[in-house]
Amino acid sequence: MKFFIFILALQQLYVQSFAQDFDFFYFVLQWPGAYCDSRHSCCYPQTGKPAADFGIHGLWPNYKTGGWPQNCNPDSRFDDLRVSDLMSDLQREWPTLSCPSNDGMKFWTHEWEKHGTCAESELDQHDYFEAGLKLKQKANLLHALTNAGIKPDDKFYEMKDIENTIKQVVGFAPGIECNKDSSHNSQLYQIYLCVDTSASKFINCPVMPHGRCDSRVQFPKF
């Protein structure tokens, strides 16, 4: 029994030796219409076209200084068996539009190995992906924006209205990133919400991400 406890303690120390201290998470949601509009092509997942909703891009540990850790534990590989109960939710809420069409495994592997391994002191692999899913449900941004009259209909909206609507929902100002379509229109692309190290509560952003947006931005259809 003592030997078993000793082994568990060694395993915990091993994880901690790779896990990096961090100050908060960026929880990043991506609008698929803007992703596809800014590229020559985008490919739907093998499960079909995702819903016209914000998809999770990632849950990224960050420092208050503006930097971030990455690839913290090369021995901690993504294992789909550990998230098998979340798979249908991941396919729906955390999809990829990269080409060629795929099942999402490569994307989730990248997110875990680059970002998730740097939060292992707080979240194991299952908890990490489950936290992202819960945060998306908690924010429910498309519902909030639509209720405020801000819809993905190719129309242009005031950035301040988008920011204020999101702030009312999560309680804190978001970071917003825009990109440009083929006509060089500034369009709503990614929304950054700051989250505490337990990945359970939205917080005030210690540092805002850099994202250039015009005062009026397009909310493209998908």
Curated annotation (Swiss-Prot):
CDD domains: RNase_T2_euk
Enzyme Commission code: 4.6.1.19
PROSITE patterns: RNASE_T2_1, RNASE_T2_2
Entry annotated with the keyword Nuclease: yes
Residues in the signal sequence: 1-19
Disulfide pairings: 36-42, 72-118, 178-213, 194-205
Catalysed reactions, as listed in the record: a ribonucleotidyl-ribonucleotide-RNA + H2O = a 3'-end 3'-phospho-ribonucleotide-RNA + a 5'-end dephospho-ribonucleoside-RNA + H(+)
Residues the record lists as binding RNA: 30, 57, 107, 110-111, 114-115
Active site: 57 (proton donor), 111, 115 (proton acceptor)
Alphabetic keyword roster: Disulfide bond, Endonuclease, Hydrolase, Lyase, Nuclease, Signal
GO molecular function, one term: ribonuclease T2 activity
Pfam families documented for this protein: Ribonuclease_T2
Recorded family membership: Belongs to the RNase T2 family.
Stated role: May remobilize phosphate, particularly when cells senesce or when phosphate becomes limiting.
PANTHER family named in the record: RIBONUCLEASE 3, RIBONUCLEASE T2
Protein name: Ribonuclease 3
Organism of this sequence: Arabidopsis thaliana (Mouse-ear cress)
Gene field: RNS3
